[in-house]
């Protein structure tokens, strides 16, 4: 009974990771490659610029490749706590920059979709990657919730500091 439960839990985690990871990777491919109606990297860089981000070229690369490579790594359960933290941050930034103030529902541009993806990333970041993961197949040591939290905090602080500098620069530009 216990063995069946563990196998079922590991399989369920893996299936959720594959589905959500591929959805996130597809969004990254839109941003990087311009496929499936996406803007491509040049168009995404313009979008990041319109969002008022400081160093828009840098953040366009970070965000798009976080989604593309991170989504694939997430699907396979590779370096899971690190990747899950990066994806959690990415979805938080998407909410803050593009969806906040538009309500909850995705149909009106709200936070529903990135919130759900971020929640799944966060849950997997604090969970053991399970038997059906590249981490386990490669014999990588369990990194645990501590690694997830450290990456989450460091990445969030980097984003907040960048945002603060961007907001301060915008104030100076408006005053000039």
Tell where the protein language model's regions lie, with residue ranges.
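Residue-level signal for alpha-helical context at structural boundaries
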Residues: 46-47, 66, 110
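Physicochemical signature of membrane-embedded alpha-helices that form the seven-helix bundle of GPCRs
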Residues: 59-66, 86
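Extended, low-polarity transmembrane helix blocks
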Residues: 1-35, 57, 79-176
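Alpha-helix boundary/capping detector
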Residues: 41, 54, 73-75, 118-119
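A general structural signal for well-ordered alpha-helical packing
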Residues: 45, 69-72, 86-89
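Membrane-interface interhelical connector segments
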Residues: 34-62
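Hydrophobic, membrane-inserted alpha-helices
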Residues: 65-74, 98-99
């Amino acid at each position: 009974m216990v063995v069946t439960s563990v196998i079922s839990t590991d399989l369920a985690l893996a299936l959720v990771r594959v589905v959500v990871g591929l959805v996130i990777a597809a969004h990254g491919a839109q941003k990087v490659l311009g496929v499936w109606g996406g803007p491509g990297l040049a168009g995404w860089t313009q979008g990041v610029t319109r969002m008022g981000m400081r160093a828009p070229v840098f953040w366009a690369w970070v965000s798009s490749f976080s989604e593309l490579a991170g989504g694939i790594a997430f699907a396979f359960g590779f370096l899971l706590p690190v990747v899950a933290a990066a994806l959690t941050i990415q979805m938080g930034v998407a909410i803050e920059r593009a969806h906040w103030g538009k309500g909850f529902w995705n149909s009106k541009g709200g936070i529903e979709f990135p919130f759900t993806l971020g929640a799944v990333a966060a849950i997997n970041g604090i969970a053991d990657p399970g038997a059906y993961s590249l981490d386990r197949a490669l014999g990588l040591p369990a990194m645990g919730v501590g690694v997830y939290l450290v990456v989450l905090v460091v990445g969030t602080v980097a984003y907040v500091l960048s945002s603060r500098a961007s907001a301060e620069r915008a104030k100076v530009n408006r005053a000039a």
